[in-house]
């Protein structure tokens, strides 16, 4: 085997940009490490904000340190880093190529809010008449508006319209958020956009999801409303 050699030695292009799939604490720290090493990084996060599951925690085990005190400075650092690009409310659509030269299609889902105009004042969420949607951030223990930011420290601090629960998209009526938006950032005509980028490396940091306790009958999770998870 040691005598084997390629018939024609060749070189392959290496794109000096990395893709991190997942904007939780693992993805954020990975992006910061790569960016601090001098390389451009894109973070693709499927929810409207980076932060991931750690943003939902009160304290961390075993030291019981404040979760937000650890996470939010890193969120701010990642968003302000000159070599990190955030693709929030986006998903990887297609990956082709090979190590050193990947081509990736990223679907930027329509927020129905112009990020370049929005000031993050929150008036649209306050005035929205549709407020009965279970909050994903609070694991269904509370409700949110049809136009919302996931949590107070969200980055970017730009709301997204949940079209399935928006009166405007379902009936053609309402439009109150557009009327109260002083910045004129509401855009009901916004559509998904496909962005194609090239990368030399891809890091998958997609995190975890909560176990479905309704599969464990001994806890009566699906029959007793007073049984909740931690």
For each predicted feature, which ranges?
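Conserved beta-strand segments of alpha/beta enzyme cores
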Residues: 40, 83-85, 226
């Amino acid at each position: 085997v040691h005598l084997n050699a390629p018939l024609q030695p060749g070189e392959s292009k290496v794109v000096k940009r990395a893709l991190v799939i997942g904007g939780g604490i693992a993805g954020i720290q990975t992006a910061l490490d790569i960016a601090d090493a001098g390389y451009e990084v894109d973070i693709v996060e499927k929810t409207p904000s980076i932060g991931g599951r750690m943003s939902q925690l009160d304290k961390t085990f075993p030291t019981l340190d404040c979760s937000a005190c650890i996470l939010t400075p890193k969120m701010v650092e990642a968003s302000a880093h000159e070599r990190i690009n955030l693709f929030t409310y986006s998903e990887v659509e297609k990956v082709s190529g090979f190590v050193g030269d990947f081509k990736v299609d990223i679907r930027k889902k329509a927020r129905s809010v112009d990020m370049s105009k929005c000031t993050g004042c929150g008036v649209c969420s306050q005035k929205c008449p549709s407020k009965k949607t279970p909050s994903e951030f609070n694991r269904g223990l509370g409700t949110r508006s049809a136009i919302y930011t996931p949590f107070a420290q969200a980055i970017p601090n730009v709301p997204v319209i949940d079209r399935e629960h928006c009166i405007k998209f379902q009936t053609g009526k309402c439009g109150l958020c557009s009327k109260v938006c002083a910045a004129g950032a509401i855009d009901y005509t916004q559509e998904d956009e496909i962005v194609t980028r090239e990368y030399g490396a891809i890091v998958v940091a997609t995190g975890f999801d909560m176990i479905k306790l309704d599969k464990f009958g001994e806890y009566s999770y699906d029959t007793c409303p007073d049984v909740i998870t931690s």
